[in-house]
């Protein structure tokens, strides 16, 4: 009898220990009221934390959550995924659509400063900025035994993250929910939307109040994205008429891994012509190093800021997570198993979800021509034809709306991500998320 009682007690103690460990990791969320480098208390509500993913919750995904500054009880809830794969979501928070930005002072050895922005999407929406896949930003694995990330696998992990996050934040379970991102997240976001939609029908209660998704300059299919660089470069006067006509005649519109020797030579000539161009926004100087007069200097300042011991303490970073933080880590063993996200867009449209697809019109990486091409391939009827959308009396870009609830828009003068035209992108998003015509 004594042995039996002892065994039961040991089992109970083990169970309590496991519960404690799970609580340590899964429920590790903290309200952040002050951040080093920002003067005074934060003028918005910021929460940071980890959510455990997997059977043993070995993967710990880190997030920043900012409540809507308007009406968090009713405003939409957005999940933001940065590209890469392997780029921290702080890229969105500090450069693209968050309420804070780096103050662009020359680094002098002291902690870089933060300043408030006027273009934050959190003015009208609550936002979760998620570091994914594992190995990105502050997300990490407690063991080496976990499923290596992939496009389709990330869609499932993100869905699991959302289910667990919403179970801890049930006050947001009825808010309209959207998935958003840019660049490489163009491969993951549509698959994530489909995964959530499938979960709502098959398994999960309560369902996530999924309404749609937002994508900026999304990578969609390598061949489409690359093939349209040539006509885009010609339109931007980066290559000559003669080279463009030769490329069209010899390569017949297929410029990816050409087997024809003459086509290969012409593609190499194209590469030489565009080698000195900033791929993200062709009108910006190409910067090799992060010097103070360069646009990407803010990335260096962010690295200094995030790696400060007091900043990491304020953000409640688990000490076991990572060593030095990097904005984009491209050493993640990642499987690119979705070759085209176009079928996911088609399925999501059939299921009735709204979508805003926007393109900075000076991006050479994913030209607006490529995005236009796959949107056009969906073959949906047009309900609002090509027209300028305005900010006061100035053209912010051009837009077209389709019968499948998809809106396509360009951002005039914009680049690969929203950071190049954050105010204009905010105006566009604000109108769309509130159901207004652009």
Curated annotation (Swiss-Prot):
A single Gene Ontology CC term: extracellular region
UniProt note on tissues of expression: Expressed in seedlings, roots, and siliques.
GO MF annotation list: serine-type carboxypeptidase activity
Subcellular locations according to the entry: Secreted
Gene3D superfamilies with a match to the protein in the record: alpha/beta hydrolase (3.40.50.1820)
Keyword Cell wall biogenesis/degradation: no
SUPFAM superfamilies documented for this protein: alpha/beta-Hydrolases
Protein EC: 3.4.16.-
Active site: 183, 363, 416
Chain positions carrying an annotated carbohydrate: 108, 347, 379
Residues of the signal peptide: 1-28
InterPro entries given in the database record: AB_hydrolase_fold (IPR029058), Peptidase_S10 (IPR001563)
Keyword list, A-Z: Carboxypeptidase, Disulfide bond, Glycoprotein, Hydrolase, Protease, Secreted, Signal
Enzyme class, first EC level, given as a word: hydrolase
Residue pairs linked by disulfide bridges in the UniProt entry: 87-328, 251-263, 287-294
Top-level lineage group: Eukaryota
GO biological process annotation, one example: proteolysis
Function: Probable carboxypeptidase.
Family: Belongs to the peptidase S10 family.
The name this protein goes by in its record: Serine carboxypeptidase-like 5
